[in-house]
A protein has these predicted regions:
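Conserved N-terminal segment of class I S-adenosyl-L-methionine
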Residues: 1-106, 110-114, 123-130, 190-192, ...
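Short aromatic-enriched loop/helix-cap "lid" or pocket-rim segments at secondary-structure transitions
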Residues: 82, 154-158, 196-201
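Hydrophobic/aromatic residues located in beta-strands of well-ordered beta-sheets
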Residues: 68, 142-144
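A C-terminal cap/extension of S-adenosyl-L-methionine-dependent methyltransferases
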Residues: 143, 186-233
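Short alpha-helix
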Residues: 165-180
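A short His-aromatic
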Residues: 119-120
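Short glycine-dipeptide loop
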Residues: 136-142
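Short, glycine-/aromatic-enriched active-site segment of Class I SAM-dependent methyltransferases
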Residues: 144-164
């Protein structure tokens, strides 16, 4: 009997992989959403798990970050990641990558997982975060982005991909962090759309906040989280 294909077998077709190019709007968005909130600087070491086509890697490189690695389990991405960054890309699943890391390897300043943690069941996600925690440098952080299951606007992001295993809210993200020996340094929304649309969203959300008995903490469809070792001062 032929092997039944999984959704990951057809992920490249579903996602329509293309090599990213950096436009000024991409750089501004990266600065606003990632670089500034995460307090990144060029001398940091950065690991991106689930780097996809390499857009975040390209932004980091444009900021002068040289000590960076991007991993993804899909080997087809090796021909899609921007050519100057292909030496930074490794086609490997995260568990294998972590198992093969030398204990003597320098600790990592920032570990990025954008649109990744929701692909793991809750227990697997906890185990992954715990394994990453011990790899963090002093003042290191794990930078996440996930669909926002607490908002009606987040459902299209959560359920638009059948490989998603866990739906996160800001509160359940804090719960996951605690279970992993981490704490949430900051949780903040991903702002999408033009300034005009964002203005209208603020008005609508403000009205709903005053109307509903239990409005969500964050209305936007996705949110970021910055996690740090709970033992860190």
């Amino acid at each position: 009997m032929a092997r039944l294909m999984t959704h990951y077998d057809t992920y490249a077709e579903y996602k329509s992989y293309t090599t990213p190019t950096l436009a000024p709007k991409h750089v501004r968005r990266f600065e606003r959403e990632v670089w500034g909130p995460g307090a990144y600087h060029a001398d940091m070491s950065v690991l991106e798990i689930g780097c996809g086509t390499g857009l975040v890697l390209a932004n980091l490189a444009a900021k002068g970050v040289h000590n960076l690695v991007g991993i993804d389990q899909d080997p087809r991405l090796g021909d899609v990641v921007p050519e100057p960054l292909r030496s930074k890309f490794k086609a490997v699943d995260v568990w294998t990558y972590l198992e093969n890391l030398s204990p003597d390897l320098a600790a990592i300043d920032r570990i990025i997982m954008f649109d990744v943690l929701e692909h793991f069941a809750p227990t697997d996600g906890q185990q992954l975060l715990d394994a990453l925690r011990v790899r963090l440098a002093p003042d290191g952080q794990i930078h996440l982005k996930v669909p926002n299951a607490s908002s009606p606007w987040g459902q299209q992001f959560q359920y638009g991909d059948l490989t998603h295993r866990t739906a996160y809210t800001p509160e359940s993200m804090r719960q996951q962090a605690i279970a992993s020996g981490l704490r949430c340094r900051r949780i903040y929304p991903q702002k999408l759309g033009s300034p005009a649309r964002q203005m209208w969203e603020r008005l609508v959300h403000g009205f709903l906040d005053r109307t509903l008995t239990a409005p969500p903490e964050i209305w936007e469809g996705n949110f970021f989280a910055l996690l740090e070792d709970a033992q860190q001062n």
